[in-house]
């Protein structure tokens, strides 16, 4: 009878890791069948020894060890500007090449010297121009123009962009940006205080400016003094005058109307009372008796 096929699970390293059972690859048959089992066993032992040896050397290699000490990368003790030929011939510290326990490493770490710096160094020692007889005296080492490095941190003040080349409709010719609401102005890299709309319309009461629209609240429509109970809503977008020249939309856009079914009392918005005259935009309420 043929021997029963033995099955094993697929190994983790294989490309498709699944629970599917795969046939074990057939072992190579020994060509000489008359070899005594003892000799075969000895050969196997030798092979295992070799494998163990290679494993050991691999573990001694620093990059395979558990605790990699990166100080091995630089065998020199510290920053030495003057190159010392003998210094580079020194071998790396052998203590760290063996795979040691973290405890021993920790103890040894404290015995390592701190990097030594060469204080006797002068500027002339670092860069000397090649001395030749043809070089005039003026361009000797004392006259070398060394470029300054760029500063690490930005200067402590902002250099604001000039409004002349920076013009956008939201800035007047003088260069003062006018904001009706706090907004992000990509042209400016400095902060500007929020301006209230009443400051932009100096001649008029703020609620008479075309920025706001009277709207009655639904629960107030049936009250006795209808005129006094209204809510001020801002109208967007707001047109901004640029020195009397209107930019964008002249007639202020009305807030969206409420459906007549819900609010039968609401008047249609009539914008004819708004007069747009640059900075001095006014609102003439023809219906009110207060004028």
UniProtKB/Swiss-Prot annotation:
Q: Where in the cell is it found?
A: Nucleus
Note whether Nucleus occurs among the keywords: yes
Basic and acidic residues bias locations: 116-125
The UniProt annotation puts motif Nuclear localization signal at: 3-6
Annotated GO CC locations: condensed chromosome, centromeric region; meiotic spindle; nucleus
Q: What does the UniProt record say this protein does? A: Required for meiosis I segmentation. Probably acts as a regulator of kinetochore function during meiosis I: required both for mono-orientation of kinetochores on sister chromosomes and protection of centromeric cohesin from separase-mediated cleavage.
Q: What is this protein called?
A: Meiosis-specific protein SPO13
What organism does the record attribute this protein to? Answer: Saccharomyces cerevisiae (strain ATCC 204508 / S288c) (Baker's yeast)
């Amino acid at each position: 009878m043929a021997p029963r096929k033995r099955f094993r699970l697929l190994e983790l390293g294989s490309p498709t890791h699944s629970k599917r059972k795969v046939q074990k690859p057939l072992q190579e048959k020994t060509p000489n069948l008359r070899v005594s089992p003892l000799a075969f066993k000895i050969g196997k032992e030798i092979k295992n020894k070799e494998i163990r040896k290679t494993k050991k050397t691999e573990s001694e290699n620093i990059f395979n060890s558990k605790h990699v000490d990166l100080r091995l990368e630089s065998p020199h003790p510290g920053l030495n500007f003057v190159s010392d030929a003998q210094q580079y011939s020194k071998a790396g510290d052998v203590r760290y090449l063996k795979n040691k326990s973290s405890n021993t490493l920790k103890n040894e770490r404290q015995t390592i010297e701190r990097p030594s710096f060469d204080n006797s160094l002068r500027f002339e020692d670092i860069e000397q121009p090649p001395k030749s007889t043809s070089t005039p005296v003026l361009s000797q080492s004392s006259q070398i123009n060394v470029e300054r490095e760029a500063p690490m941190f930005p200067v402590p003040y902002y250099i604001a962009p000039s409004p002349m080349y920076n013009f956008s409709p939201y800035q007047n010719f003088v260069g003062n940006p006018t904001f009706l609401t706090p907004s992000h102005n990509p042209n400016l890299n400095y902060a500007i205080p929020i301006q209230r709309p009443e400051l932009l319309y100096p001649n008029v009461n703020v609620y008479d400016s075309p920025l706001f629209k009277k709207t009655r609240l639904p629960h107030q429509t049936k009250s006795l003094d209808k005129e006094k109970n209204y809510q001020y809503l801002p109208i967007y977008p707001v047109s901004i005058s640029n020195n009397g020249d209107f930019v964008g939309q002249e007639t202020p856009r009305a807030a969206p109307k409420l459906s007549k079914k819900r609010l039968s009392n609401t008047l249609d918005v009539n914008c004819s009372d708004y007069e747009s005259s640059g900075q001095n935009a006014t609102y003439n309420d023809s219906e009110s008796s207060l004028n």
